[in-house]
Regions:
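Peptidyl-prolyl cis-trans isomerase
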Residues: 232-283
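Sec/Tat-exported extracytoplasmic proteins
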Residues: 51, 58, 100, 104, ...
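Second-shell loop/turn segments in exported
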Residues: 33, 37, 82-97, 106-116, ...
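C-terminal motif of bacterial Sec signal peptides marking the signal peptidase cleavage site
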Residues: 20-27
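PPIase-associated folding chaperone regions across multiple families
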Residues: 148-228, 278-365
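Bacterial N-terminal signal peptides that target proteins for export
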Residues: 2-13
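Cross-family detector of peptidyl-prolyl cis-trans isomerase
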Residues: 30, 38-44, 247-249, 254, ...
Length: 365
């Protein structure tokens, strides 16, 4: 899935990317033109936002294709690498061009399908944009020397209107996607398929971690003391299996270790959504949890903790409704991308080379 279409999951993705990245190029007015696609003008701001998506995608693609390369090593430079026989920079440029074409395709598809963003959603997006431009931000002040992120974007080629249109385009992507694959859509994904994806990829757990370390943070080596800790953990598991609420046992442990944490009152406050691909705290731990019976507490003996763990059926909570969009995107995101990119196959494209050069991948990376 290209980065521009990953905004199906959250139209604020590009905002998050830009907030955590440092733009280094000199600014240009929001009215600067990056080019035209199907006769539609692409402002520099829209081009830059799509380029940031492309840069993120290129980094992800490189890591996927080169899992043994330490990209965090001192002196590592993505722009000295190649992807699929292309320079990293050229790869980003190609993705950027496609992202811009996808942007236009989304606009055209949205109109042709007769869709509309409801006023509440539009107001929420506009409020977020206005807040970005008007709310003072200490991070922006400390790191970028400006009062607001809006001022920061303006200095670096992304005007308020471009930012707004980019966010609205993300919402349009989401609405198109849901009109095809969501409830009542032309290619509605069956509930059984969604549930199957959830149960294969996620589970819910709660745990209490009984530390094997002393107050100084050193691992306890005394077997008698370790045995006491294990007995404590097993006692908690027995209480849970005997019908005591998990939250009550958890609070009991907090008192035992004289922890001043806020007392847990709701059971689901302790829920953890665990991905099958997770490696925290270890791959062995995750594999063990996925093999557990539902609602039966067990003690897992790890290097530094005795974990009192309970696994729960993810389909019994509210998670299915809460994360349904994630499941749909994982199941049908690539198909959606193919559909959109097919729309762009014969698009006429003309980029302003001066603008493209000014906002090169190297300049924003």
């Amino acid at each position: 899935m290209t980065m521009s279409l990953k905004r199906i999951l959250t139209s604020a993705l590009a905002s998050a990317v830009l907030v955590t990245s440092a733009l280094t190029f000199s600014g240009c007015a929001d009215t600067s033109v990056a080019g035209t696609i199907e006769g539609v003008t692409i402002p520099a701001g829209i081009y830059i936002l799509n380029e940031y998506d492309a840069l993120s995608q290129a980094i992800s693609d490189f890591k996927d294709k080169n899992p043994d390369v330490d990209t965090n090593a001192e002196g590592f430079d993505f722009f000295a690498q190649t992807i699929d026989g292309k320079s990293f920079s050229d790869y980003v440029k190609e993705l950027t061009a496609q992202n811009c074409k996808n942007y236009i395709a989304i606009e055209k598809m949205f109109d042709s399908m007769g869709l509309a963003i409801d006023e509440a959603e539009k107001s929420e997006i506009l409020a977020d944009v206005n807040a970005t431009w008007s709310n003072e931000n200490t991070y922006a002040q400390d790191f970028y020397g400006v009062d607001t992120y809006g001022e920061y974007y303006e200095k670096n080629g992304v005007g308020k209107n471009s930012y707004k249109e980019f966010m609205l385009n993300g919402k349009k992507s989401e609405l198109i996607f849901n009109s095809i694959y969501g409830e009542g859509g032309s290619k509605e994904v069956a509930q059984a398929e969604i549930e199957k994806w959830f149960t294969e990829n996620y589970t819910v757990m709660r745990y209490i971690s009984v530390s094997k370390k002393d107050k100084d943070g050193k691992l306890i080596e005394d077997e008698a003391k370790l045995s006491e800790l294990k007995d404590l953990a097993e006692g908690y598991a027995e209480k849970i299996n005997g019908g005591t609420k998990f939250s009550e046992v958890y609070n009991e442990y907090l008192k035992h270790i004289e922890e001043d944490e806020v007392e847990i009152k709701e059971e689901n406050e302790l829920d953890i959504l665990l991905s099958v691909e997770s490696t925290s705290p270890s791959e062995e731990f995750v594999k063990h949890v996925y093999g557990m019976e539902f609602e039966k507490a067990e003690v897992y003996d790890a290097d530094t903790y005795y974990y009192v763990v309970v696994r729960y059926d993810i389909l019994k909570g509210d998670y299915l409704d809460e994360y349904k969009q994630v499941a749909l995107s994982e199941l049908k995101g690539d198909e959606m991308t193919a559909t959109v990119e097919a729309e762009t196959a014969n698009y006429s494209v003309s980029f302003n080379q001066a603008t493209v050069d000014q906002f090169s991948p190297e300049s924003i990376g």
